[in-house]
Amino acid sequence: AWNEIWIKESGAPVIEFQKNGIAMIDESGKKRVWPQVISVCWNYMGLKQGTLVPLRDTLTPFRHGESVVLPDGEVLGYGCFLPTEYSIRFLDEELGKIGNPLYRAVGWQLLYEGVLNKKVKGEFFVKLCIKHLPAEKDNLIVNRTLSFLRSVYSTYLDEGSRQLLQDDLERFCMNMVNNKAEGKNKKSYFNTLLSICSSSKTCSYMAGILQGAELPTGVTINDQDRINIAFNLALRDTSMYEEVKGYVMKTVRNKDLLDRFEYVLPSLSGNKQVRDSVFNALLVNENRVNEVWVAECLRWLNHPRRRMEAEEYVPKILGALLEIQETGDIFFPNSWLNAGLSGHTSKNVYSMVNTFLEKHPNYPQNLKLKILANSDHLRRIYSGEETR
């Protein structure tokens, strides 16, 4: 019954367009069906057609599967919609020209889902952002797509691909900040540039802004932004640790922000012994009074730039989870896991997570599900080869 599958059971279907129709795939293997209607946009003789298609079975006949552009353009359905080879090619050429902003947003979401499900390569997605985002004016679409871009860049590219794309991506963001972006979009590109910056040129640019250099037209920063810039600079250039500390302590007047800054900053130290001491302190309940600050420390300790040195923290992060649940806020176990695992992409960490779950077959189900959810990116990375 509709109520049983939608309300009383977990999971969601994967919806994939095939030559002989629309497949609804239940990844649990139970062959469940989620009855629904989707809005399919397809290309026929140069004309973009849209039609409502009811899905009532594991396979629904559909004649135009090979020319589908957007599997659910009006966002009526529920599930993971996978791009087709045709939709990838079409969006590669036309995404920035689509007039309907909803369809553009759906196109970006579809391509990002394609990266997560190995239908689209991360490098392709990054290049598509550089190609099509300059034409995008809608702030919601820009923000959403830049969040996808940051995720793909930090998680779904190998180190070699990251290095190959680094200069182009920095130039793109810098150009959008200084020249092409409009209004609120400038700040979105500025924040993305800060999160991905690696070159000495861009780091020097950010250091200048922290120290009072003139901001690009249309960009404003507050004390929270200054602290974020300081954290990123301390992470990327350990020689600047004391310099940025001194600048923040001298220029920021808000006591709450300064207290947070002083609490979190040691987690960015270039000295691993200092970082180890910070991590070990977080394992002691008395030091976890401010759980938001704790999660921020843990996130910096396990930042992608420190992921190799931080791998040894992972077993203890998992091992502390029961205590975290017993002593913390109801939401703290999830934020603890997200901060501790999201920066890691190695097969070694994936093995650590699987080993932990295998060694604890009777682990509380709610915590097991949180571990699986926060290590899902690792499962996606190591679940097979990309098809494009």
What are the residue ranges of the model-derived segments?
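Non-catalytic accessory/interaction domains
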Residues: 1-388
